[in-house]
């Protein structure tokens, strides 16, 4: 949220004079959607999509249901215009992107896969050295199996490049999956390690 101006400037530079048409949120943790309000202010016509199960929470702006209040996150209020539905294909930047459910880090998470270039936007489902904290587990809900299923989906997609939610783009997908699976196995064997 504190980097909203930099986000707008970066998007403006990347668009090179074009209009921002869509904001697609992989999940609604504030470090991923905290710039939405600023982007909507800069491009008022932009369509903003969120994962299923979160549309009503955003439209009613429920900071508790969105987990901002309980976790101490700050996120400026933004509007949601629609849902990015797992199983759908969305056109972004003249390319067709497949939407895949990716629960684990967040129960509503999605990843986006562009099959022509074999590019995966993995959000926090896969990083080069692991994956994001499995928040449902911290709240007493079982979610390690969902992380494993999400890693299986990513492996089946066979991306050549991964653009993670944190860190640099990478191409050693097999290596990243191996690290993630090892980390997951460690957490499953000793859940207290995950909570630290």
Task: Describe these PLM feature segments.
Residues 2-3, 96-187:
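Metallo-beta-lactamase
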Residues 2-92:
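Active-site HxH/HxHxD metal-binding segment of metal-dependent hydrolases
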Residues 193-196:
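C-terminal regulatory/interaction regions
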């Amino acid at each position: 949220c504190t980097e909203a101006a930099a986000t707008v400037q970066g998007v403006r530079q990347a668009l090179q004079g074009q209009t921002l048409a869509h904001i697609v949120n992989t999940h609604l943790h504030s470090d991923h959607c905290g710039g939405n309000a600023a982007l909507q202010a800069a491009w008022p016509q932009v369509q903003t999509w969120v994962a299923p199960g979160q549309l009503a929470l955003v439209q009613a702006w429920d900071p508790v249901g969105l987990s901002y209040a309980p976790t101490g996150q700050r996120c400026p209020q933004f509007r949601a215009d629609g849902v990015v539905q797992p199983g759908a294909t969305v056109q972004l930047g003249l390319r067709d992107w497949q939407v895949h459910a990716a629960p684990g880090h967040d129960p509503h998470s999605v990843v986006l896969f562009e099959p022509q270039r074999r590019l995966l936007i993995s959000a926090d489902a896969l990083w080069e050295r692991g994956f994001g904290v499995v928040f449902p587990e911290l709240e007493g809900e079982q979610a390690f199996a969902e992380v494993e299923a999400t890693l299986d989906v990513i492996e089946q997609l066979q991306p050549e490049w991964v653009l993670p939610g944190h860190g640099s783009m990478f191409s050693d997908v097999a290596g990243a999956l191996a690290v993630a699976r090892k980390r997951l196995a460690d957490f499953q064997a000793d859940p207290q390690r995950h909570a630290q």
